[in-house]
């Protein structure tokens, strides 16, 4: 007893964590779990029953022993209830001991039963658990079916470790996850079918998922039975599922196929349920929202469950289960209170009864009253129960004598599941109101039907505003027969009987109307002919949002909606608008806006040709403030991408926009105002409930909505070709005529359920069919308008010309001809009423297009055949044709020429567009046919002229673009142009001289061949229709006479020459050898070889011969403050002759006003930008307007004299060796120093050392430099840090909008900088590799920026062997040197940027200035110091290696651990970290000696012989 007392006191501490885990297992389907007391009671009871096991520790072995003994007990030895509780609690403790986590007690019992109870090895029952399960703790085999050595097979139970691993995966990732599927497929390869299904059933998981898995397995079994009729060698479903088999029988080889099929079924079921769980409509994801009523939640849930492709029993189970588990907490509590323990088995109707008031104010007050009410006595059942059917306490709704109420129709006597109207979900009775608009309308059935008495019979007729006639299938012969009548509608052309004066009655309204009797009609229709007489109107705005989903739209961030006042309207327009708005309000399309909706959009109206008013809304401001939606449809469908079909039908959706609801929170921004005439009353404000016309998102919302509605229907009909663009629907098929019309009829009925109507008069059945501006025929397609209007010579406005060209461009897919002259005519004045003049060339172009449109016909796409695209040159454009058979184009098109692209590049651009069109319209990659020869295109690709080629291409001999018949090698009447071009005096020049005395020359860069061709091009530009060209270039001469029909153009100059020559009447081309004494040829050669006065830019004007200078133009408006100087850069670069220099002077008109030019000398050969320095001597500000002549450039002859010494007779007081006290002629170096400084802006020390001028003269040069004075740097040096050879600092700096990465070597001051794309780690690591390759650094200092401290950066530094340290950002002590370098770099860069075209070039020039041109105190640059340090390192390393190469030592050897005598000295042959190798002279052997037995000595000195 003492032991027992201690046991009770301790409370089984070794099982503390096990008991804690056991307390999380639920007792049943509710939330009640096991307690610690339950576990202690079970353990104590077991100790009491089995005293021989009491002293043993609670291991898994003991638990299995106790479990075996409990199974041997009979219930009579203890009470049945306590025995069952004891066994169940022990099973839970055993599962927790093994690390398993069953959800319920029942699941725990199943797991233990599977692990022990399924074993059929009865001989091992009495053995210990370790012997029975040798692999319980660590498993070596996972297969229950094992091959015996003696032959045959045996069965072995699934091991607990395997089961535990599967259970863990199921709990962590889910029962239908891919991870669980892979694990199960791995372990279950040789399991029996029974093992597979039992393990799957015992896995933790959602009960609904398990039911779905079971349903999928049943479907697989049914499919097996259908596909495999019973036979002698056919497996049955029972054999596959392991029903009625022992484990030994199921493990035999003849059942391998059955096991594999069973495993395949299970994997398929898991995948199916997993895919279902990922779908948006998955019912298990449908959960009740906090603000949602339980009825709305159930409606969404039932809709999702009904859409699931599962059997009815599974749907029933899902409805019963998910209606409770997915409900909100309040509803679950209410159902628990009302339905008690049977809440899981209660029907959906009972749960709806229980929760119908949840969330209402009364419900909240009821909960509050219950919370404040004192608790009643125990045992008073039913006192607080209340019937939600009659409201009386004491009984539940299902016990109410008044009868249960249906929550669908509201009538008593039946439940919702038995309601007859349930199948007509969404239908309402006549006179009901639509939930979204609350507007009365005739019928809300889908499709809408009403009861009408026709003759003597009552019939249900479909209300169809698109039908002209009323059609019935039978008639009682009342009325007046009018013979046969032919109708054309959705069923094609049909014939019926017409009856007039027929008695028609709707409610109390009776009329005499006309009907058509058509026995074959699938539906009886009430047409427009009788609807108006009966007073029936069908509203097209079906705003029931449960049917048509609304698309969410909203304003842009920060916008408040439009607030534009309504402008005044005339009385006539107000009356027209009132009539329209009243009709819209009656139909529920607009509603009265509340006072707090303050937004407003102006409205107005125009009168149509018919005399009716049309309402227009100015949505421009609202469109600006509204967020855009994605484009639902990126373009029009094209008939060339349609497949040929036997039957086609074109449908048109009536009132498409007005059928779709507008997103309700957005409606407040669509308000508009109806004014009151003369302000006799308050204005009436309305808002839109449907998609309004003119709103920018109406097309996108409409298209997205139709996509949602039609997606399922299209998937169910894969045999048809379906197309939709806005409200136009195309249906094509190869089915029979009746079947095709049946599908069309089905679609009409389907979309009619959503309120969309298809007007009968807009339906087109069969060919020819008009669709989206195209006319479809059985074998071809055309445009609806086959002809273009004619144009005649004479004036035409730009507006009319644009409309004509727009009509042509729309039809280019059948015309395929370019109109360059007409397009050029559209250039110039953009005013719409500006006039152009049509000439004969324009008329000819237009007529060619009109003729092509008449002749061309498009064909349909055949998916069995390949598609080809053939490109060819047109008139200043590229034309291509897409076809599958020669002569039968699908479509054609034109790509107009693009400037600055060669012909080859333009063809490739057109090929890219062609390929894109074909892929979009057919989904295939076309085979491209290019004009010319394959080797030419391959050469273009290799030369880099083009960078893309089609995937599949070949060549054909294209049509001739340029003709050579007007180029001959004979003299033609007309002037002669002597052309020449080439590199003259280091510069490219070209020009020509004519026989009439005209001259032309320009400077231009290029090769000699290019310049020769350019000279011919300029001559062709200026020459008349007939002319002669003389050249000394054999290359240019042969090119002009080449056979251009087969030539693929290789450069743009040749292409331009061909185009110019093509427009000439006749050209004679002649060649003369150069430098052979031909006067005209030598003259043109001399002419372009001269260095002539040339200018670039628009900042200078030509002068008259008598003028002194050339006027310079002010580039922009300049303001000069009083007494200030301003430097103005003008748009001018000038190239002076050798014997010229120039001076910039003041204009007299400016000098009179006190504005002067401060000098300016331009040396001969200067080619930089011209700058003018202006000084304002006035005491007030002066403004120089743009374009004003404000200075003049004066050319001066250059006079140069050689300086000679004064001679011996001349004396000077300043020195004995000539001019200057230094005795050197340094004065000659000052201009050179100034010129060098203007290039690089180096410091005075550098100039002093490089040019040998005095320090003061060098400082004067720097001080007189305006650029250096403006960008003068501060001289304060802030902070410092580690400096040394090969130690660098790095940091980013910004110059304007550019990012520069700057490195500086701390010892020499050498700078390395690169412009980078961003401050990213990847960019920094790329630049690090470049930096390392050039400088081989050893250490680096940076701040803590993310690019520098990234893990990848640290790994790179470690890989390169660079010691990387980081400092503190913004701390001058940490990054002093690189921060100083930033300032130096940017100041120098600012000086050099005007001298370079590219920023990268200016940056490179800055590095030259700072690294090479900048000299230190000892006359060395940073580059000199860096190179010197590297050379010293090399010398030291070489010396060190030589010293370490030969070493000598004394050594001793050991015998049995005892050291011997020292021997030596001798040379070390090899040295390692712990030992050396020497050669023993006595034995002539190589010995390995440990370093502890070695004494190194200096090498012996050589004794010099006397």
UniProtKB/Swiss-Prot annotation:
A zinc finger (Integrase-type) spans 1228-1269. Residues 1270-1430 form the Integrase catalytic domain. GO terms for biological process: DNA integration; DNA recombination; establishment of integrated proviral latency; nucleotide metabolic process; proteolysis; symbiont entry into host cell; viral genome integration into host DNA; viral translational frameshifting. The active site is at 464 (protease). The RT polymerase active site binds 2 magnesium ions. It catalyses: 3'-end directed exonucleolytic cleavage of viral RNA-DNA hybrid; Endonucleolytic cleavage to 5'-phosphomonoester; dUTP + H2O = dUMP + diphosphate + H(+); DNA(n) + a 2'-deoxyribonucleoside 5'-triphosphate = DNA(n+1) + diphosphate. Zn(2+) binds at residues 1237, 1241, 1265, 1268. Belongs to the retroviral Pol polyprotein family. This is Gag-Pol polyprotein. It comes from Maedi visna virus (strain KV1772) (MVV).
């Amino acid at each position: 007893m003492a032991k027992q007392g201690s046991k009770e006191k301790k409370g089984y501490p070794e099982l503390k964590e096990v008991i804690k885990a056991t307390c999380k297992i639920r007792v049943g389907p509710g939330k009640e779990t096991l307690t610690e007391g339950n576990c202690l009671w079970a353990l104590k009871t077991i100790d009491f029953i089995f005293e021989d096991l009491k002293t043993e520790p609670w291991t898994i072995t003991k638990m299995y022993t106790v479990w075996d003994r409990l199974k041997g007990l009979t219930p009579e030895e203890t009470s049945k209830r306590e025995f069952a509780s004891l066994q169940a609690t022990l099973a839970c403790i055993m599962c927790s001991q093994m690390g398993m986590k069953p959800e319920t007690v029942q699941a725990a019992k199943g797991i233990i039963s599977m692990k022990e109870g399924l074993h059929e090895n009865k001989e091992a029952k009495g053995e210990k658990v370790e012997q029975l399960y040798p692999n319980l703790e660590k498993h070596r085999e996972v297969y229950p079916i094992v091959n015996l050595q003696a032959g045959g097979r045996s069965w072995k139970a699934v091991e607990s470790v395997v089961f535990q691993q599967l259970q863990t995966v199921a709990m962590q990732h889910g029962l239908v996850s891919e991870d669980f599927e892979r694990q199960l497929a791995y372990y279950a390869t040789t399991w029996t079918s029974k093992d597979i299904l039992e393990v799957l059933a015992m896995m933790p998981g959602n009960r609904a998922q398990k039911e779905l898995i079971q349903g999928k397995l049943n479907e697989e079994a049914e499919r097996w039975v259908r596909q495999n009729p019973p036979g002698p060698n056919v497996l049955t479903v029972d054999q596959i599922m392991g029903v009625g088999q022992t484990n030994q029988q199921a493990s035999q080889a003849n059942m391998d196929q059955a096991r594999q099929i069973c495993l395949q079924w299970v994997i398929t079921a898991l995948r199916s349920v997993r895919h279902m769980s990922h779908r948006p409509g998955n019912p298990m994801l449908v959960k009740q929202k906090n603000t949602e009523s339980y009825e709305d939640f159930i409606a969404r849930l039932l809709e999702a469950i009904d859409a699931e492709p599962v059997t009815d029993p599974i749907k029933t189970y899902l409805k019963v289960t998910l209606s409770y588990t997915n409900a909100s907490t309040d509803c679950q509590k209410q159902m628990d209170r009302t339905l008690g323990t049977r809440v899981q088995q209660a029907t959906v109707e009972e749960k709806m009864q229980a929760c119908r008031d949840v969330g209402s104010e009364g419900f909240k007050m009821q909960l509050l009253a219950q919370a404040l009410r004192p608790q009643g006595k125990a045992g008073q059942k039913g006192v607080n129960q209340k019937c939600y059917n009659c409201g009386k306490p004491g009984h539940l709704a299902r016990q109410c004598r008044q009868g249960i109420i249906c929550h669908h129709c509201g009538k008593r006597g039946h439940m919702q599941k038995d309601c007859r109207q349930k199948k007509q979900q969404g239908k309402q009775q006549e006179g009901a109101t639509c939930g979204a608009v609350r507007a009365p309308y005739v019928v809300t059935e889908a499709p809408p039907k009403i009861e009408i008495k026709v003759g003597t019979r009552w019939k249900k007729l479909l209300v169809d505003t698109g039908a002209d006639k009323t059609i019935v299938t039978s008639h009682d012969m009342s009325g007046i027969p009018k013979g046969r009548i032919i109708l054309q509608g959705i069923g094609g052309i049909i014939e019926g009987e017409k009856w007039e004066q027929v008695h028609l009655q709707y409610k109390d309204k009776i009329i005499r109307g006309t009907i058509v009797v058509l026995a074959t009609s699938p539906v009886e229709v009430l047409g427009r002919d009788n609807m108006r007489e009966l007073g029936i109107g069908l509203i097209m705005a079906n705003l029931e949002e449960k049917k048509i989903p609304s698309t969410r739209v909203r304003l842009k961030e920060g916008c408040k909606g439009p607030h534009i006042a309504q402008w005044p309207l005339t009385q006539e327009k107000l009356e027209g608008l009132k009539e329209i708005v009243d009709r819209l309000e009656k139909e529920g399309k607009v509603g009265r806006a509340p006072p707090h909706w303050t937004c407003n959009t102006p409205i107005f109206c125009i009168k149509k040709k018919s005399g009716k008013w049309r309402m227009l809304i100015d949505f421009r401001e609202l469109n600006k403030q509204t967020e855009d939606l994605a484009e639902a449809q990126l373009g029009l469908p094209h008939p060339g991408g349609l497949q040929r079909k036997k039957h086609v039908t074109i449908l048109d959706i009536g009132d498409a926009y007005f059928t779709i609801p507008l997103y309700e929170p957005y409606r407040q921004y669509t308000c508009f105002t109806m004014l009151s005439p003369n302000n006799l009353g308050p204005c009436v404000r309305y808002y839109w409930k449907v998609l309004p016309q003119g709103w920018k998102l109406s097309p996108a919302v409409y298209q997205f909505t139709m996509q949602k509605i039609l997606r399922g229907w299209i998937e169910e009909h894969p045999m048809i070709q379906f197309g939709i663009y806005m409200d136009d629907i195309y249906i094509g098929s190869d089915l029979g005529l009746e079947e095709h019309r049946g599908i069309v009829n089905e679609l009409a009925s389907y979309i009619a359920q959503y309120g969309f109507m298809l007007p009968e008069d807009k339906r087109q059945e069969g060919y020819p069919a008009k669709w989206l501006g195209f006319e479809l025929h059985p074998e071809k397609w055309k445009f609806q308008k086959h002809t273009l209007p004619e144009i005649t010579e004479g004036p035409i406005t730009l507006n009319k010309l644009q409309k004509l060209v727009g009509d042509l461009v729309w039809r280019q897919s059948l015309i395929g001809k370019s109109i360059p002259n007409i397009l050029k005519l559209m250039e110039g004045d953009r005013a719409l009423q500006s006039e152009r003049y049509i000439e004969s060339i324009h008329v000819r172009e237009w007529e060619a297009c009109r003729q092509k449109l008449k002749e061309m016909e498009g064909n349909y796409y055949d998916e069995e055949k390949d598609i080809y695209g053939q490109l060819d040159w047109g008139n200043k454009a590229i034309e291509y044709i897409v076809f599958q058979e020669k002569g039968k184009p699908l479509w054609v098109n034109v790509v107009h020429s693009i400037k600055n692209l060669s012909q080859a590049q333009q063809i490739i651009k057109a090929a890219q567009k062609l390929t894109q069109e074909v892929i979009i319209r057919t989904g295939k990659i076309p085979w491209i046919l290019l004009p010319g020869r394959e080797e030419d295109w391959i050469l273009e690709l290799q030369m880099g002229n083009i960078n893309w080629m089609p995937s599949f291409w070949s060549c054909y001999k294209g049509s001739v673009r340029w003709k050579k018949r007007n180029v001959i090698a004979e003299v033609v009447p007309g002037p002669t142009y002597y052309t020449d071009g080439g590199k003259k005096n280091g510069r490219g020049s070209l020009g020509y001289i004519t026989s009439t005395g005209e001259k032309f020359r320009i400077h231009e860069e290029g090769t000699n061949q290019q310049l020769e061709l350019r000279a011919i091009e300029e001559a062709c530009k200026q020459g008349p229709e007939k002319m002669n060209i003389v050249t000394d270039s054999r290359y240019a001469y042969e090119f002009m006479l080449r056979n251009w029909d087969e030539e693929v153009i290789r450069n743009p100059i040749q292409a331009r020459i061909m185009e110019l020559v093509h427009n000439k009447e006749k050209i004679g081309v002649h060649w003369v050898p150069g430098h052979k004494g031909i006067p005209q040829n030598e003259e043109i050669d001399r002419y372009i070889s001269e260095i002539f006065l040339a200018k670039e830019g628009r900042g200078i004007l030509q002068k008259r011969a008598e003028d002194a200078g050339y006027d310079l133009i002010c580039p922009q408006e300049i303001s000069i403050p009083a007494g200030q100087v301003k430097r103005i850069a003008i748009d001018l670069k000038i190239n002076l002759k050798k014997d010229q220099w120039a001076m910039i002077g003041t204009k007299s008109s400016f000098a009179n006003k006190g504005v002067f030019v401060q000098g300016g000398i331009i040396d001969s050969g200067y080619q930089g930008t011209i700058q003018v320095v202006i000084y304002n001597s006035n005491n007030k500000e002066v403004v120089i307007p743009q374009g004003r002549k404000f200075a003049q450039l004066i050319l001066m002859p250059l006079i140069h004299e050689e300086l000679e010494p004064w001679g011996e007779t001349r004396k000077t007081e300043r020195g004995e060796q000539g001019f200057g006290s230094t005795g050197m002629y340094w004065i000659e170096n000052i201009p050179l120093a100034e010129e060098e400084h203007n290039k690089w802006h180096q410091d005075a020390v550098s100039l002093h050392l490089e040019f040998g001028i005095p320090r003061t003269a060098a400082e004067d040069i720097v001080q007189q430099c305006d650029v250096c004075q403006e960008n003068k740097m501060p001289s304060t040096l802030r902070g410092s840090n580690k400096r040394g050879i090969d130690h660098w600092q790095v940091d980013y700096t910004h110059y304007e909008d550019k990012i520069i990465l700057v490195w500086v070597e701390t010892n020499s001051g050498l700078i390395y900088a690169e412009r980078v794309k961003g401050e990213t780690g990847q960019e920094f690591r790329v630049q690090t590799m470049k930096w390392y390759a050039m400088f081989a650094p050893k250490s680096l200092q940076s701040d803590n920026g993310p690019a520098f401290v990234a893990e990848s950066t640290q790994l790179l530094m470690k890989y390169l062997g660079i010691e990387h340290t980081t400092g503190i950002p913004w701390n001058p002590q940490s990054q002093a040197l690189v921060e100083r370098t930033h300032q130096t770099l940017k100041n120098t860069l600012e000086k050099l940027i005007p001298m370079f075209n590219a920023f990268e070039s200016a940056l490179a020039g800055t590095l030259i200035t700072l690294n090479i041109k900048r000299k230190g105190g000892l006359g060395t640059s940073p580059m000199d110091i860096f190179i010197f340090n590297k050379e010293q390192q090399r010398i030291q390393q070489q010396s060190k290696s030589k010293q370490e190469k030969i070493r000598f030592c004394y050594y001793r050897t050991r015998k049995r651990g005892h050291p011997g005598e020292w021997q030596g000295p001798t040379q070390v042959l090899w040295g390692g970290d712990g030992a050396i190798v020497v050669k023993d002279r006595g034995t002539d052997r190589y010995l390995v000696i440990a370093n502890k037995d070695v004494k190194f000595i200096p090498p012996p000195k050589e004794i010099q012989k006397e």
